[in-house]
């Protein structure tokens, strides 16, 4: 049933909203499993250390994560002037990849057969916090 006026519901929802700086990349053309290899390497690390890790990581997902991490740092510095975040004090509080849609493709095989190829996508999120 009704839980109150719309403005009251919005006010309550905004009170519990996560206010940590973050960045999200939707529909990244990398599978969740491959993205998690890179994300597991930077989880809990300081921002400068995480940038160094993804810069020299040879995986394809690391270039996507590097751009996303730089975006999260810029979001922290520009979108939260009252908190006055500095890059040297930030660390990767949360980072995860959720499953996105899958593109189905056909690969022709011998004797008129066709195999299905699934090109997987993911939604990658990085949340920073201050130490």
From Swiss-Prot:
The keyword Ribosomal protein applies. This protein binds specifically to 23S rRNA; its binding is stimulated by other ribosomal proteins, e.g. L4, L17, and L20. It is important during the early stages of 50S assembly. It makes multiple contacts with different domains of the 23S rRNA in the assembled 50S subunit and ribosome. The globular domain of the protein is located near the polypeptide exit tunnel on the outside of the subunit, while an extended beta-hairpin is found that lines the wall of the exit tunnel in the center of the 70S ribosome. It comes from Agathobacter rectalis (strain ATCC 33656 / DSM 3377 / JCM 17463 / KCTC 5835 / VPI 0990) (Eubacterium rectale). CDD domains: Ribosomal_L22. Belongs to the universal ribosomal protein uL22 family. Residues 1-20 are annotated as: Disordered. Keywords: Ribonucleoprotein, Ribosomal protein, RNA-binding, rRNA-binding. This is Large ribosomal subunit protein uL22. Coiled coil: none annotated. InterPro entries: Ribosomal_uL22 (IPR001063), Ribosomal_uL22_bac/chlpt-type (IPR005727), Ribosomal_uL22_bac/org-type (IPR047867), Ribosomal_uL22_CS (IPR018260), Ribosomal_uL22_sf (IPR036394). It holds the Pfam family Ribosomal_L22. Residues 1-11 have a biased composition (Basic residues). GO terms for biological process: translation. The keyword Metal-binding does not apply. It comes from the Bacteria. SUPFAM superfamilies: Ribosomal protein L22 (SSF54843). PROSITE patterns: RIBOSOMAL_L22. Part of the 50S ribosomal subunit. GO terms for molecular function: rRNA binding; structural constituent of ribosome. One of its GO terms (cellular component) is cytosolic large ribosomal subunit. HAMAP family: Ribosomal_uL22_B.
């Amino acid at each position: 049933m009704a839980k109150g006026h719309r403005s009251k519901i919005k006010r309550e929802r905004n009170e519990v909203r996560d206010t940590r700086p973050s960045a999200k990349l939707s529909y990244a053309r990398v599978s969740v499993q491959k993205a998690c290899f890179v994300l597991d390497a930077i989880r809990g690390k300081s921002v400068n250390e995480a940038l160094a890790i993804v810069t020299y990581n040879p995986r394809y997902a690391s270039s996507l994560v590097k751009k996303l991490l730089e975006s999260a740092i810029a979001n922290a510095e520009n979108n939260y002037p009252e908190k006055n975040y500095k890059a040297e004090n930030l660390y990767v509080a949360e980072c995860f990849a959720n499953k996105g849609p899958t593109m189905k493709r056909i690969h022709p095989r011998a004797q008129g057969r066709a195999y299905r190829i699934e090109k997987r996508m993911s939604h990658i999120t990085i949340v920073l916090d201050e130490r």
